[in-house]
Amino acid sequence: MKTTKELLNFWEDQMKLSHTSSNYFFRKSPSHYHMMLLVMNAYKCNENLTVEELKTKLFKTSRPKSALMINEACEKGFFILEKTSNDQRKKFIKPTGSFMKEFEDYLKKLREISI
């Protein structure tokens, strides 16, 4: 029962955060949350994820909608796009430093609840 109450408190605290925060943005839809997990997984595994690969991996999301979501995440400062030296058309998507910290804090709180 304690864990359930802690989880409820955690969720309520997350929802109280500013609507401009990543918490709000990545919970807009399952596709937004999926995008966050794909980018962070690639980053944690030291893999390069291109914008095109991300668009393909986002299930049940059209390519135009995926592009809008990616652009919005970049505009809000959660992700950055890096061009490759080999092919200027190919762009890798990476989390920003500030978003990486938010994500780590989020995971830390989740771990504390589950222990």
Task: Please identify what each model-predicted range represents.
Residues 18, 104-115:
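Amphipathic alpha-helical dimerization/coiled-coil segments
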